[in-house]
A protein has these predicted regions:
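Residue-level recognition of single "structural anchor" positions
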Residues: 1-224
Length: 224
């Protein structure tokens, strides 16, 4: 079956567009499967590829993007099961997130909880100086950065990071928690949805897929 979005696909292009449209409506895989008549296994496979496409888009638009980050997307996702810390910062009216890879978890836990102070030089070496907040997804808690080496205590005034975190927590509840293997993709999806909340999501994602078809992201473990 000819399908420009995915080679050797078993569903036609119109069905892929339907899945994408339902995805943009922020429905769950079960809801999409029930509406489209496509099996949940196939829906989940497509959603994973779509979310990976979105993650690449987010990485490319991150102010601290480095070209090799695209090759680390799978690595980021795999590290999530071991590390649940994500840095959050705002730049030019947009919210960005980054997985904090390979930190000393004991040191990081103590730092974000205000138990220890850290020299700014160490923060710069670990790329932690750029964040306005750090989210701990293992506990669904957000720690706000007050200054270079300290964290705030108590509730800060509501700003865009608070709004983004509220949306992120709502998604955690909606999906009844996040599987450790897909946490990274859901976080990037939330970042994408928040930064493009007033845009046509379907048009953006469809253009991405047309430029880079899903079969470029396909993995051996994905079934169609």
């Amino acid at each position: 079956m000819k399908n420009r979005y995915l080679k050797n696909a078993r569903i036609p292009e119109r069905k892929v567009r339907e899945l994408l449209n339902l995805f943009c409506e922020d429905l769950t895989a079960t809801q999409i499967a029930n509406i489209s008549g496509v099996s949940r296994i196939t829906v989940n496979a497509y959603l994973k590829l779509i979310r990976t496409q979105i993650a690449q888009y987010c990485e490319e638009h991150n102010p601290y993007y480095h070209g090799n980050r695209l090759n680390q997307i799978g690595t980021d996702a795999n590290h999530t099961s071991e590390n649940h810390f994500y840095g959050i910062f705002k730049s030019e009216q947009f919210i960005y997130t980054r997985n904090i890879l390979n930190p000393d978890n004991v040191w990081l836990n103590n730092w974000v909880r205000g138990k220890i102070n850290v020299e700014n030089e160490i923060l710069v070496q670990n790329d932690l100086h750029i964040y306005e907040a750090i989210a701990d997804f293992s506990r669904a808690k957000l720690f706000r950065v007050n200054s270079g080496s300290h964290f705030t205590k108590g509730r800060s005034k509501i700003d865009e990071i608070d709004l983004f975190w509220g949306i992120m927590k709502s998604r955690i509840v909606k999906f009844r928690g996040l599987n450790s293997s897909t946490t990274y993709l859901h976080i990037k999806e939330s970042e994408f949805r928040y930064n493009n909340r007033n845009a046509d999501l379907f048009a953006i994602i469809h253009a991405l897929i047309q430029k880079r078809p899903l079969h470029y992201l396909r993995q051996e473990s994905v079934f169609f």
